[in-house]
A protein has these predicted regions:
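A short alpha-helical cap/connector motif
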Residues: 1-108, 113-134, 138-195
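Conserved acetyl-CoA-binding loop-helix of GNAT-fold acetyltransferases
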Residues: 256-269
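Conserved short alpha-helix immediately C-terminal to the canonical SAM/SAH-binding motif I
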Residues: 70-74, 263, 287-288
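Conserved beta-strand in the GNAT
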Residues: 223, 229-237, 244-247
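Conserved acetyl-CoA binding element of GNAT-fold acetyltransferases
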Residues: 241-253, 303
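Short amphipathic alpha-helix that is part of the acyltransferase structural core
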Residues: 8-11, 194-216
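Conserved active-site alpha-helix within GNAT-family acetyltransferase domains
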Residues: 284-302
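Conserved GNAT acetyl-CoA-binding A-motif
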Residues: 271-284
Length: 309
């Protein structure tokens, strides 16, 4: 039995989570097809994935982070036994505290699932211009799609957090994300070349009768600006157990999908903080956009878009 097979067997015997075969093959194919040379891994476990990545080419360099001291120590030994200590640098630290300035062609997130969004937001700044971020375990053994498979409260809470992360990926206008049915579910996110960082400004003065009424009803009104150009005005408010978003004005019709995603990302945190899991969007008929599934939205017969968090 070779070194990598022994590592895999050790992980199985000791219930140490490692990437499933199909998921690992997908990531390795991505590394080869995209010519990735520098890889950052969040969650080393015992070094199984990092070793597989480094074995793809002598030109591949891997930096990997593991918080658990026992797994870190085992990974150090495994990397050394495979003769890869010069190309795999492992750090024993909480990834959220790690200070890394390098840029990477591929970032692989496979650590604490409850922290996925924080990992994504922190390390997206370490992504090269044409790099990709891959996240594993988005199906969580089928329980994300079918939560009735478990009655454990802690597991149910984790499933909700994974669902929120998937929602975050689908809505995030800064990245184009595809989720693949590989292994336990993996996402691949690439920078969106059309993305412009938006600004949000509260509308405090009624510019017209419609906005005046929205303010009178107690709705929060915001404008979205991209490069100092207003692209839309929207209101949002809570109604029973869901949020309602109403687009008042849309200036950049050619960017309607990104404008909607920007707005959803802005409102999403308020919804989650309020314990809201459903957002209803009212969009004028003439502005209905094509990227419904990509933005995680469902269209209903009454002309409303639904987004589940």
């Amino acid at each position: 039995m070779n070194e990598i097979s022994e590592i895999k067997e050790y992980a199985k015997r000791n219930s140490i989570p490692i990437v499933l075969d199909k998921g690992g093959e997908f990531i390795c194919d991505t590394i080869v097809n995209r010519g990735c040379k520098k890889i950052l891994e969040i969650g080393s476990a015992i070094g199984y994935s990092a070793i597989n990545f480094a074995n793809l080419s002598p030109d591949i360099y891997v930096r990997t982070i593991e918080i658990d001291i026992d797994r870190y120590s085992r990974a150090v030994d495994n990397i050394k036994n495979c003769g890869l200590q010069d190309r795999i640098k492992i750090i024993n630290e909480d990834a959220l505290d790690a200070k890394i300035d390098e840029k990477f062609d591929l970032i692989f997130i496979d650590a604490a699932k409850a922290q996925y969004e924080k990992f994504f937001e922190k390390f997206k700044h370490n992504l090269s211009e044409k790099g990709v971020i891959i996240t594993d375990n988005l199906f969580f053994h089928g329980m994300v799609e079918n939560p009735s498979l478990t009655h454990n409260y802690s597991t149910i809470k984790l499933i909700r957090k994974i669902r929120k992360f998937v929602s975050f990926l689908q809505l995030n206008p800064e990245f184009n994300t595809t989720i693949y049915d590989k292994g336990d579910g993996v996402s691949l996110s690439m920078l969106n070349p059309d993305f412009i960082q938006p600004e949000y400004k509260a509308v405090t003065e009624a510019r017209n009768e419609t906005i005046a009424k929205e303010i009178e009803y107690g709705h929060k009104i915001f404008s979205i600006f991209e490069n100092e150009t207003e692209t839309g005005v929207f209101s949002f408010y809570r109604k029973e157990d869901f949020f309602v978003i109403n687009f008042i004005e849309i200036s950049a019709t050619e960017r309607i999908e990104i404008t909607v995603r920007n707005m959803l990302m802005f409102v999403r945190k308020d919804a989650i903080d309020s314990g809201i899991h459903l957002i209803k969007i009212k969009l004028p008929e003439e502005y209905r956009f094509n990227g419904i599934k990509e933005a995680g939205l469902t269209y209903t017969e009454d002309g409303t878009y639904i987004h589940k968090l």
